[in-house]
Amino acid sequence: MNIVVCLKQVPDTAEVRIDPVKGTLIREGVPSIINPDDKNALEEALVLKDNYGAHVTVISMGPPQAKNALVEALAMGADEAVLLTDRAFGGADTLATSHTIAAGIKKLKYDIVFAGRQAIDGDTAQVGPEIAEHLGIPQVTYVEKVEVDGDTLKIRKAWEDGYEVVEVKTPVLLTAIKELNVPRYMSVEKIFGAFDKEVKMWTADDIDVDKANLGLKGSPTKVKKSSTKEVKGQGEVIDKPVKEAAAYVVSKLKEEHYI
């Protein structure tokens, strides 16, 4: 069994700031992490490796520093890593990104492709399904459980008010959610060992793709501006006996027409 896991290195949203003039994310000085849903996808691939001897390859698109996410994935237990990095990929929206990653995946052997449900720096949930379309394989999204029976997978797909169980044959793309598992910790030995492993670097010339579909040229959508919500509320400390405090809260709620 060969598994490919799509990873994205994203800024830690707990420390994200917005440039008030440009309306863009300020990434300088902000620590980066593996996108959380992608980490669940990787963990499930590693579970299948533990149980069935699967070979796990991680792939990412990004600048050279995105290699850090792939090294972390190798430390967790991935067998191989590929970074798609080229200035031609810059400015890509979800469509151009999916074109690029799918072209990279086509160079690899795969039975299952895992991706996270969505990235925390965009929240579109588009790249995984788009990759499946470019590869011409079925997809199951919002996956919260995976069972293997030969070349057939039994998948539990989450819905807002329940779940659905589906069976699908490989090859298939699955998008993971946090309920799927708890990602493992890395051992010190594996962390040091990961730095000795090769991360393959592929440019636009290394993949079979129409360059008109890459980067800014291949992106039909443009982000004009990003912003954070302005916090308008204010707190008030009520220093009164319990009954008086309760009456005061009720009066305030009525005053604001909440009750």
Swiss-Prot record:
Cofactor: FAD; AMP
GO molecular function, one term: electron transfer activity
SUPFAM superfamilies: Adenine nucleotide alpha hydrolases-like
SMART domains (UniProt xref): ETF
Sorted UniProt keywords: Electron transport, FAD, Flavoprotein, Transport
Pfam family, one: ETF
InterPro entries given in the database record: ET-Flavoprotein_bsu_CS, ETF_a/b_N, ETF_b, ETF_beta_N, Rossmann-like_a/b/a_fold
Cofactor note: Binds 1 FAD per dimer.
Gene3D superfamilies (alphabetical): HUPs
The keyword Repressor appears for this protein: no
Subunit structure: Heterodimer of an alpha and a beta subunit.
Similarity comment: family membership: Belongs to the ETF beta-subunit/FixA family.
Its job: The electron transfer flavoprotein serves as a specific electron acceptor for other dehydrogenases. It transfers the electrons to the main respiratory chain via ETF-ubiquinone oxidoreductase (ETF dehydrogenase).
Protein name: Electron transfer flavoprotein subunit beta
Gene source species: Clostridium acetobutylicum (strain ATCC 824 / DSM 792 / JCM 1419 / IAM 19013 / LMG 5710 / NBRC 13948 / NRRL B-527 / VKM B-1787 / 2291 / W)
